[in-house]
């Protein structure tokens, strides 16, 4: 599953926060917008008219051009990832700067930007040690801006939480400056939006986290948006054999386009590990769980050769567990590691991914299998739930 973290607040916490936010921002200037909202678990998403407050100190308002429809957004609507509702969805967005707050010098009106759901402070232990994707500031801004407030309000004036500190399934959004990356204006914004999560998460899992080596063997479980990018990350890194694993023939066919040398449909199969071990000629050097299920992580670990590395990429439900044999782990020298947001360094990695796309090496055009208007958002989520291959993108107006 595409990367995000959930946080469950008590009703008292939410009510207290809402009252504080309402008092603080009653007099703020706002921008009317339409946004895609989740109000109740398991219910269809709705398109609502909201108000987006103008940027405060250290913040930027963007006019969205496009937003990818990510499985993490779906997980927030069904409770797989726990988020306080109501919630403005979206964390995979690209757009144009519409206004800047006090003290903002990195961005100017008219700049093209991509959202990053990891808010990087640059000061904590993780940022200072070269692991900004683990920045503690992000943990304080899972459904708000880093200051604990929101800039989004519904028609009744009630505050709306924002998914992953972004909430970019909206015509306008106000984000903290640390949640944005400036990009080349020549880059198509609907393609750029994909880099914000699905591409960065999958590609980065292969290139940044696992550091796939040329000539190696890799197995990728799950060929959704993240899995396809893990496949092409392995391909660009020079893996000699890349096995794509899924239950959908359509997704497996698409995986070939992204660099898979072999495919394996697990539908009805019981001896998955043995079959993949044989297919890879004695096990894989790298295996990726891009679905987000404990049992699939176990399968990924099991298909490794001695000394191999399994990477869990998708975010599982909080109660899901991984069970491994401790003796087996010790004597095989295998490694199991997590990859959050593809171990991203957004300010460095986003421009590099764009350069790869513009040179023809990174496939983004092929990733988009359908675009939707904001009014078609419920259909976009239904298609995602049904397992439509590739990535759906919501396009706002005519600026993509």
Q: Which ranges hold each PLM region?
A:
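C-terminal hydrophobic helical "lid"/dimerization subdomain
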Residues: 24-31, 298-302, 347-400
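C-terminal substrate-binding/catalytic core of Rossmann-like NAD(P)-dependent dehydrogenases/reductases
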Residues: 273, 277, 281, 318-370, ...
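Adenosine-nucleotide cofactor-binding segment
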Residues: 217-223, 233-299
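NAD(P)H dinucleotide-binding glycine-rich loop of Rossmann-like/cofactor-binding domains
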Residues: 106, 123-221
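Glycine-centered, small-residue-biased loops immediately flanking beta-strands
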Residues: 308-309, 334
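Acidic carboxylate diad motif detector
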Residues: 313-314
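N-terminal Rossmann-fold NAD(P) dinucleotide-binding loop
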Residues: 227-228
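Glycine-rich beta-strand-centered segment in the early N-terminal region that forms part
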Residues: 53-67, 77-128, 133, 184-186
């Amino acid at each position: 599953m595409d990367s995000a973290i959930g946080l469950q607040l008590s009703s008292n916490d939410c009510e207290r926060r809402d009252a504080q936010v309402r008092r603080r921002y009653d007099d703020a200037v706002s921008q009317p917008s339409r946004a895609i909202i989740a109000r109740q678990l398991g219910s269809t998403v709705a398109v609502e008219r909201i108000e987006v407050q103008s940027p405060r100190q250290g913040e930027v308002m963007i006019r969205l051009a496009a937003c990818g429809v990510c499985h993490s957004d779906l997980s927030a609507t069904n409770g797989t990832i726990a988020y306080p509702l109501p919630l403005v969805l979206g964390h995979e967005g690209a757009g144009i700067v519409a206004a800047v707050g006090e003290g903002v010098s990195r961005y100017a009106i008219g700049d093209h930007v991509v959202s990053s759901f990891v808010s990087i402070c640059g000061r904590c232990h993780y940022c200072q040690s070269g692991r900004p994707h683990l920045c503690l500031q992000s943990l304080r801004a899972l459904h708000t801006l880093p200051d604990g407030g929101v800039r989004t309000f519904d028609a009744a004036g009630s505050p709306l939480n924002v998914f992953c500190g972004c909430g970019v399934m909206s015509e306008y959004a106000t984000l903290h400056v640390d949640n944005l990356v400036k990009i080349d204006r020549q880059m198509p914004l609907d393609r750029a939006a994909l880099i914000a999560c699905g591409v960065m998460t999958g590609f980065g899992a292969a290139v940044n986290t696992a550091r796939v080596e040329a000539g190696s063997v890799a197995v990728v479980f799950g060929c959704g948006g993240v899995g396809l990018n893990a496949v092409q990350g392995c391909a660009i890194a020079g893996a000699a054999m890349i096995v794509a694993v899924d239950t959908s023939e359509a997704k497996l066919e698409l995986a070939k386009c992204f660099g898979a040398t072999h495919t394996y449909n697990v539908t009805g199969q019981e001896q998955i590990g043995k079959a993949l071990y044989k297919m890879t000629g004695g096990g894989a050097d790298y295996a990726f769980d891009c679905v987000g299920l404990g049992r699939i992580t176990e399968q990924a670990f099991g298909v490794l050769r001695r000394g191999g590395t399994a990477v869990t990429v998708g975010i599982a439900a909080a109660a899901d567990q991984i069970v491994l044999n401790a003796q087996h782990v010790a004597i095989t020298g295998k490694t199991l590691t997590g990859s959050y947001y593809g171990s991203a360094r957004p300010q460095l990695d986003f421009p590099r991914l764009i350069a790869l796309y513009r040179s023809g090496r990174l496939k983004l055009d092929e990733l988009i299998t359908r675009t939707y208007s904001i009014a078609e958002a419920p259909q976009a989520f239904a298609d995602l739930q049904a397992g439509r291959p590739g990535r759906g993108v919501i396009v706002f107006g005519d600026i993509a």
